[in-house]
């Protein structure tokens, strides 16, 4: 399993761990990368529209 993808400079490795099948809590993702949080939050109030 690749632990450090080529795009690791775009996001924390923890986000890639989730993509590769390791389940993470949202509370672990959001503080790790504030700039990505609007795209990762799954709250119905803050969810990005499906067409974006």
From Swiss-Prot:
Keywords: Eye lens protein. The keyword Transmembrane does not apply. InterPro entries: Alpha-crystallin_N. GO terms for molecular function: protein homodimerization activity; structural constituent of eye lens. Pfam families: Crystallin. Transmembrane segments: none annotated. The keyword Transcription does not apply. It comes from the Eukaryota. Homodimer. Aggregates with homologous proteins, including alpha-A-crystallin and the small heat shock protein HSPB1, to form large heteromeric complexes. Belongs to the small heat shock protein (HSP20) family. May contribute to the transparency and refractive index of the lens. This is Alpha-crystallin B chain. It comes from Columba livia. The gene is CRYAB.
């Amino acid at each position: 399993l690749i632990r450090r993808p080529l795009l690791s400079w775009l996001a924390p490795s923890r986000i890639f761990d989730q993509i590769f099948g390791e389940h993470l809590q949202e509370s672990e993702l959001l503080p790790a990368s504030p700039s990505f949080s609007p795209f990762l939050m799954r709250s119905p109030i803050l969810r990005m529209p499906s067409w974006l």
